[in-house]
């Protein structure tokens, strides 16, 4: 049996803010897919990914005005970036600041920090360089 990881879906409340956030992390917008049922626009799916990878992040916007709770089961998504400081500067332009200053888990290890996306999802950002 051959299997592969395809995507993760997160519900969002403001697609434009979410798009700016994930593009600041280096993701590219790939496509938009409206979901129409019984002639009504029910949801719009927005797909993002990194240029060198097939896996995607699907952001779903439900047009019925639903509100969401993050729940206790969600932990975080981890994203590796080439230059942590540059990524954080780009996010700061959107008013997004790290929960605390970047730190190393172990001496000589990668620098990392956590931020929240526009819907409150926790995102770990790990600097590769």
Residue ranges and their predicted role:
Residues 2, 9-54:
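Core segments of cupin and vicinal oxygen chelate
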Residues 32-35, 47, 79, 88-129:
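Vicinal oxygen chelate
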Residues 42, 73, 109:
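Exposed loop/turn and edge beta-strand positions of beta-sandwich/beta-sheet ligand-binding modules
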Residues 5-7, 72-77:
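Eukaryotic phosphotyrosine signaling hubs
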Residues 52-57, 69:
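Arg/Lys-rich, alpha-helical DNA-contact motif
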Residues 61-63, 127-128:
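Acetyl-CoA-dependent GNAT
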Residues 14-16, 82-85:
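Helix N-cap motif at beta-to-alpha junctions
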Residues 21, 84-90:
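Short amphipathic alpha-helices within nucleic acid-binding modules
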